[in-house]
Amino acid sequence: MASRGVVGIFFLSAVPLVCLELRRGIPDIGIKDFLLLCGRILLLLALLTLIISVTTSWLNSFKSPQVYLKEEEEKNEKRQKLVRKKQQEAQGEKASRYIENVLKPHQEMKLRKLEERFYQMTGEAWKLSSGHKLGGDEGTSQTSFETSNREAAKSQNLPKPLTEFPSPAEQPTCKEIPDLPEEPSQTAEEVVTVALRCPSGNVLRRRFLKSYSSQVLFDWMTRIGYHISLYSLSTSFPRRPLAVEGGQSLEDIGITVDTVLILEEKEQTN
């Protein structure tokens, strides 16, 4: 349509100019010749209009697919951006769930293990157990120890002398709590590591020399809050009570390598 308008304007502006030129160049031209010339001009303009129209349509036929393809590409690009955005949101949500459900518990467990190892290396493994801390304040800890001892004695049906706490003059002091020998270094010769699995589920570890008296195991039990009258030791595999006799060393009772011992409550007796 635009091309036809251009042709029309060109024709209207060209007719007067052609007439003037003809009158100047051929002053004696007749009306018949003038009409014939105008017919030829009109025919030429018609042919020119037809050529322009066909050419424009032909060019538009090549141009329209390109525009269509460009629009399709823009739509596809927008669609891909939307899909990528959704994928990124889904991946971010998965990463958050992974951090919350897997990574964070794993880090907390790792920190707990490092804390347990630190306390075991510094000889403060009693902080990890749920036993009684002996040798504390004589006012409150004495009363709590007496109460727990009586309750344990009632549940275990122990003889009467064990249910009564000694008089103040006969009460054991902190000095009577068994002392453990100094823990040898890990690189020392004849050293073994004993892991003690408590009823609470905690596992305590300590190093001893094979030449130490086997009584040191019971002293260790008492020191972390498990009295030998209420608890016993047994081997993990095969499961059997640990036989300890006076004068025997750890090597004599079979503890020659790193060993796991089970600390369990004694059975009730009627």
Swiss-Prot record:
<keyword id="KW-0256">Endoplasmic reticulum</keyword>
<dbReference type="GO" id="GO:0005783">
    <property type="term" value="C:endoplasmic reticulum"/>
</dbReference>
<dbReference type="InterPro" id="IPR001012">
    <property type="entry name" value="UBX_dom"/>
</dbReference>
<dbReference type="GO" id="GO:0030674">
    <property type="term" value="F:protein-macromolecule adaptor activity"/>
</dbReference>
<comment type="function">
    <text>Involved in endoplasmic reticulum-associated degradation (ERAD) for misfolded lumenal proteins, possibly by tethering VCP to the endoplasmic reticulum membrane. May play a role in reproduction.</text>
</comment>
<dbReference type="GO" id="GO:0036503">
    <property type="term" value="P:ERAD pathway"/>
</dbReference>
<dbReference type="GO" id="GO:0000151">
    <property type="term" value="C:ubiquitin ligase complex"/>
</dbReference>
<keyword id="KW-0472">Membrane</keyword>
<feature type="domain" description="UBX">
    <location>
        <begin position="187"/>
        <end position="263"/>
    </location>
</feature>
<dbReference type="InterPro" id="IPR017247">
    <property type="entry name" value="UBXN8"/>
</dbReference>
<feature type="modified residue" description="Phosphoserine">
    <location>
        <position position="167"/>
    </location>
</feature>
<dbReference type="GO" id="GO:0007338">
    <property type="term" value="P:single fertilization"/>
</dbReference>
<keyword id="KW-0812">Transmembrane</keyword>
<keyword id="KW-1133">Transmembrane helix</keyword>
<feature type="topological domain" description="Cytoplasmic">
    <location>
        <begin position="55"/>
        <end position="270"/>
    </location>
</feature>
<dbReference type="GO" id="GO:0005789">
    <property type="term" value="C:endoplasmic reticulum membrane"/>
</dbReference>
<feature type="topological domain" description="Lumenal">
    <location>
        <begin position="23"/>
        <end position="33"/>
    </location>
</feature>
<dbReference type="GO" id="GO:0005730">
    <property type="term" value="C:nucleolus"/>
</dbReference>
<keyword id="KW-0597">Phosphoprotein</keyword>
<feature type="region of interest" description="Disordered">
    <location>
        <begin position="130"/>
        <end position="171"/>
    </location>
</feature>
<dbReference type="InterPro" id="IPR029071">
    <property type="entry name" value="Ubiquitin-like_domsf"/>
</dbReference>
<comment type="subunit">
    <text>Interacts with SYVN1 and VCP.</text>
</comment>
<dbReference type="Pfam" id="PF00789">
    <property type="entry name" value="UBX"/>
</dbReference>
<dbReference type="GO" id="GO:0043130">
    <property type="term" value="F:ubiquitin binding"/>
</dbReference>
<dbReference type="GO" id="GO:0005654">
    <property type="term" value="C:nucleoplasm"/>
</dbReference>
<feature type="transmembrane region" description="Helical">
    <location>
        <begin position="34"/>
        <end position="54"/>
    </location>
</feature>
<dbReference type="InterPro" id="IPR050730">
    <property type="entry name" value="UBX_domain-protein"/>
</dbReference>
<protein>
    <recommendedName>
        <fullName>UBX domain-containing protein 8</fullName>
    </recommendedName>
</protein>
<feature type="topological domain" description="Cytoplasmic">
    <location>
        <position position="1"/>
    </location>
</feature>
<feature type="transmembrane region" description="Helical">
    <location>
        <begin position="2"/>
        <end position="22"/>
    </location>
</feature>
